From Swiss-Prot:
Keyword Nucleus on entry: yes
Coiled coil: none
Cellular location(s): Nucleus
Superkingdom of this protein's organism: Eukaryota
Origin species: Arabidopsis thaliana (Mouse-ear cress)
Function of the protein: Required for the initiation of lateral roots independent from auxin signaling. May function in maintaining the pericycle in the mitotically competent state needed for lateral root formation.
Name of the protein: Aberrant root formation protein 4
Length: 626
């Protein structure tokens, strides 16, 4: 067992007298002469140091000695923790820890304990004792009682900063989940005890609590229910605080409460490992907090409610805004959970059918919803089931929506285009990596519908960004195929066709003449090259027919068939590509004749060669007419 040597600051008899005042038996002191050096067990040493702290405060000029004893006490506990950490399965050491914590609690609970001493110890003991909370259930209970004792005896505002500092330190402990439990429990009590400036105090504490909860959620063996209980306890305390306030401060505290609840929804959802339905009972308990602030599911899924909350609480404080990094994800998940279970909707007194109807009929709110769903669709930590429900919701709100509905020139989509683009980028990744064919099929349908819902002037900007940033030739091919399909739909309005046609040249050039320089890679980019050639071939034929019919709807036809653009395509795209394809085919046939990989490459290049020669023929024909 670890031994600790006593410092001979006081005589043994003096120390004994102080220990007796705390109810310590004579047998706790070994030795009988004033000059004897005493060697004690850890629990006895802790009692002695606490008694020395008490006696030094009573003596004139003893503050320096007091600080020294407190430092030694903390060092003693740290050393004890290090020894236990080295041999976590040593039951004997665990028993020693329980004895030490029990002695600390007894001394702190003594009626003779001086207030100055307990105030000074409060700056150190909550942090250092919380390390022992994960050793055993008994240790957890004792640490919680120690923290509660400080909360009861000390100034609430002091304890708020002390516990926040201890919580921040607990994030680095081996088991942040267990070690933070008594601190969070104590903090929930402190919130209620604060007498003034409640909002300012909570605004400092809540981000620290959220950081701890997020760290806990990332632990591999986290118990979601335990995590939720911790989070819910804090939420209940904040609600109790708001109920005691009036006017503006109450409104701010309620907004802060809503932000906290939305953020922990995201944290808890990410920690769920089995099925999405596991979050339903938890979200049902959170809904009353949100409805008490007047939040609605329409406001959550459009992001309007979270913007109002942030504006009220954070204002221009960018640093505080960063304390809620997952607020939009949480708001989206709250809505999706209501979609998963009618019980959640009932808890919020919401009718989701009316929300869907509103989104179907209101383009602006629908675009806002697209932007909010990107947080679910792009998350790498959520279960696929959440993403499946998000895709199904996209299909619900775009059902029956046509491109003509969103082409109202009075409605400006530019503010929402970045959010829609981010959502579609996540959708393209889902198409490639979804775990089953049904989800991939639904996601592809959602991609087509959302693209068609973007007003024509902005649709190309989104498509160009998707093609430019695509890292998959197959996905690039899919996107170019959608452009070709939109050109071929006779139901589209002229302005819609014009917007698509105007930018065909630029889209094709992105593939056939990559912006980073050099020729496209073969056979790696075969899918994208073939799709680009097919799109260009279709555009040439389409515009030729339109011109022959006298339907030059815009300058689009003359652009694609203009001598300048035809010569550019011929010299800069088609002829260099013809050389590249011919050399690639010849090289594969020559070097690896009969090899399966070689035959596969040739099989990829042959369709490209066929469409390429057809494009060259068409361009040469059009050039002759100029």
């Amino acid at each position: 067992m670890v031994k600790f040597a006593i410092i001979n600051t006081l005589t043994v008899n003096e120390t004994w007298a102080k220990l007796k005042s705390f109810g310590v038996m004579e047998s706790s002191i070994e030795g009988s002469s004033e000059s004897t050096t005493v060697t004690t067990s850890p629990s006895r040493r802790v009692r002695e140091l606490l008694a020395l702290c008490f006696s030094s405060v009573e003596e004139a000029g003893g503050f320096q000695d007091f600080e020294s004893f407190v430092t030694e006490l903390v060092s003693c506990l740290d050393s004890l923790y290090e020894n236990v950490a080295l041999d976590a399965n040593n039951e004997l050491e665990n028993d020693v820890i329980e004895e030490v914590l029990d002695e600390i609690l007894k001394v702190l609970s003594s009626p003779q304990m001086d207030q100055d001493v307990i105030d000074a110890l409060s700056f150190h003991l909550p942090k250092v004792t919380s390390k022992f909370a994960d050793i055993s259930s008994r240790c957890l209970q004792l640490v919680e009682e120690i923290v509660d004792r400080f909360v009861e005896a000390c100034n609430p505002r002091d304890m708020l900063s002390i516990l926040c500092e201890a919580l921040d330190a607990a994030r680095c402990y081996h088991s942040a989940s267990t070690c933070s439990t008594p601190l969070l429990h104590g903090l929930s009590k402190v919130f209620i005890l604060i007498q003034r400036r409640h909002y300012e105090q909570l605004k400092v504490a809540v981000p620290i609590v959220l950081n701890v909860l997020k760290d806990i959620s990332l632990e591999t063996d986290v118990q979601v229910e335990d995590l939720f209980d911790k989070a819910l306890g804090i939420a209940s305390s904040i609600r109790d605080v708001s109920s005691k306030l009036n006017n503006e401060e109450e409104a701010k505290v309620r907004c802060l409460l809503c932000l906290y609840v939305i953020q922990i929804t995201a944290i808890i959802s990410v920690s769920i490992r089995d099925k999405a339905a596991s979050c339903i009972p938890l979200v049902i308990q959170l809904e009353p907090f949100l409805t008490s602030c007047g939040l609605t599911h329409l406001g959550l899924i459009t992001g309007n409610d979270t913007e109002k909350l942030m504006s009220t609480v954070a204002g221009d404080d960018d640093e505080f805004i960063t304390s809620f990094p997952d607020i939009s994800l949480g708001a989206s998940l709250l809505f999706i959970c209501a979609k998963i279970s009618h019980e959640v909707a009932e808890a919020a007194n919401a009718v989701l059918g009316s929300v869907v109807d509103e989104l179907q009929n209101n383009p602006v709110k629908r675009w806002q919803a697209y932007g909010m769903l990107k947080y679910i669709l792009s998350s790498g930590d959520l279960l696929w089931e959440f993403k499946r429900h998000a895709i199904e919701f996209l299909l619900d709100i775009t059902k029956g929506v046509t491109s003509s509905q969103c082409n109202d020139e009075q409605i400006d989509c530019s503010d929402y285009t970045p959010g829609i683009y981010a959502t579609l980028q996540a959708v393209t990744l889902l198409i490639m990596y979804a775990p089953d064919a049904d989800l991939r099929k639904k996601t592809f349908e959602a991609l087509k519908r959302v693209l068609s819902d973007i007003p024509a002037p902005h649709r190309f900007d989104v498509l160009r960004a998707l093609v430019t940033n695509s890292r998959s030739p197959s996905m690039t091919a899919i996107l170019l195929g959608l452009v070709k399909d939109s050109m071929s739909k006779s139901s589209l309005q002229d302005t819609d066709c014009a917007a698509v046609d105007t930018h065909v040249i630029e889209l094709v050039e992105l593939v056939l003449r990559p912006p980073q320089g050099g020729p496209p890679l073969l056979p790696d980019q075969s899918d994208a090259i073939l799709a680009a050639l097919n799109l260009y071939r279709f555009a040439l034929l389409f515009e030729s027919r339109e011109c022959e019919a006298g339907k030059e709807r815009s300058k689009v036809g003359s652009d694609i068939l203009s001598k300048k653009n035809l010569e550019k395509a011929y010299k800069e795209w088609l002829l260099p590509l013809r050389t590249l394809v011919s050399c690639s085919i010849a090289e594969n046939l020559k070097e690896d004749h009969g090899q399966e990989s070689s035959l596969d490459d040739v099989g990829l290049l042959n369709p490209i060669e066929l469409v390429l020669y057809r494009c060259i023929e068409l361009v040469e024909e059009k050039l002759k007419s100029h």
